[in-house]
């Protein structure tokens, strides 16, 4: 991306503060889309009319988790299978003087404005309606690199109510507007254009999701490591980093981001390959002489120990690991890598050789400005108890198991330059 086409975050915040819209583009490996984003409490009829005419996408309002609870904005569906984990709630219309069907420009502007008004209550809205609220993850773009979180972060940083309106931008023919079309749109209407990647960098300079709590020397059967414990500001979990050698140089560092698996890591369960991957990663780091293993408390791909054991029971009935999660009302993978990225940043890691079979983890970390120069496979020998599990990870979750590890299967070019 040519940096001259983009504006600074501060310039975008000033426009939002003045009641203007900005264009925000996300990662090309995620949705590669541009959205109009503005502050909900600054909305006008003219703004809504402009969005419906020039954007043509779905007009939504991003709210915080706490605000969604206050307004009783329940999830649109019990089982969210959205490809990008978009947290839609039930749609709403404002109950206010002058609001009729909910679809007119005036009606939608009033609904958006009332969603951005912190004095509004649940009784001020009818359900369903014509505006679609989205629940932003706590921690904003530092937890999830999406337009929903960007809208809330930008509104808050601009000094407005932490509620943002957003709408995908489509071309005249109905296709998604990509960067070349968004640059033309920026010039035509004099709008600021920013990237979520730059917003992440901006937030990382000002906010932290974790802080170092304590560091200790830890001799293990794999070798000796520095064990650093981190406290999280967004939940009650403590995360760990196993560090070997100097990881702050420009030389790429061997890195493993490992999510907790008590059954596999501690009790050597044959249902998964987690324990073997953990042991292999620590062994490889010791052999390399330098590296980092981040241990995140995200048991059961984020669903927790109790639900993971419930999923095991379903798997014994014939469900695969993805189907079991979904039957329990969860997505196949609820992990987020924002905290892991912040820990790596705190440790001074700049470039990494990432030990993973999971392409989602690659994209998840790259979204936070970390440069991954190589993917190092961690394929473990299967056993009769986990063969079906490994096949499902390959076939349904896209894990690169039993495939070529050439550069055609792993794109690293885009991390070389920041927009």
From Swiss-Prot:
Example of a GO biological process term: riboflavin biosynthetic process
Cofactor annotation remark: Binds 2 divalent metal cations per subunit. Magnesium or manganese. Binds 1 zinc ion per subunit.
Catalytic activity, as annotated: D-ribulose 5-phosphate = (2S)-2-hydroxy-3-oxobutyl phosphate + formate + H(+); GTP + 4 H2O = 2,5-diamino-6-hydroxy-4-(5-phosphoribosylamino)-pyrimidine + formate + 2 phosphate + 3 H(+)
Cofactor(s) the protein requires to work: Mg(2+); Mn(2+); Zn(2+)
Active site residues according to the UniProt entry: 333, 335
UniProt binding sites for D-ribulose 5-phosphate: 30-31, 35, 144-148, 168
Location of region: DHBP synthase: 1-205
Taxonomic superkingdom: Bacteria
Listed EC numbers: 4.1.99.12, 3.5.4.25
InterPro entries per record: DHBP_synth_RibB-like_a/b_dom, DHBP_synthase_RibB, GTP_cyclohydro_II, RibA, RibA-like_sf, Riboflavin_synth_RibBA
Pathway(s) it belongs to: Cofactor biosynthesis; riboflavin biosynthesis; 2-hydroxy-3-oxobutyl phosphate from D-ribulose 5-phosphate: step 1/1; Cofactor biosynthesis; riboflavin biosynthesis; 5-amino-6-(D-ribitylamino)uracil from GTP: step 1/4
Site feature: Essential for DHBP synthase activity: 130, 168
GO molecular function, one term: zinc ion binding
Record has Nucleotide-binding as a keyword: yes
Residues reported to bind Mg(2+) 1: 31
Family: In the N-terminal section; belongs to the DHBP synthase family.
PANTHER family, sorted: 3,4-DIHYDROXY-2-BUTANONE 4-PHOSPHATE SYNTHASE, GTP CYCLOHYDROLASE II-RELATED
Stated name of the protein: Riboflavin biosynthesis protein RibBA
Organism encoding this protein: Pelodictyon phaeoclathratiforme (strain DSM 5477 / BU-1)
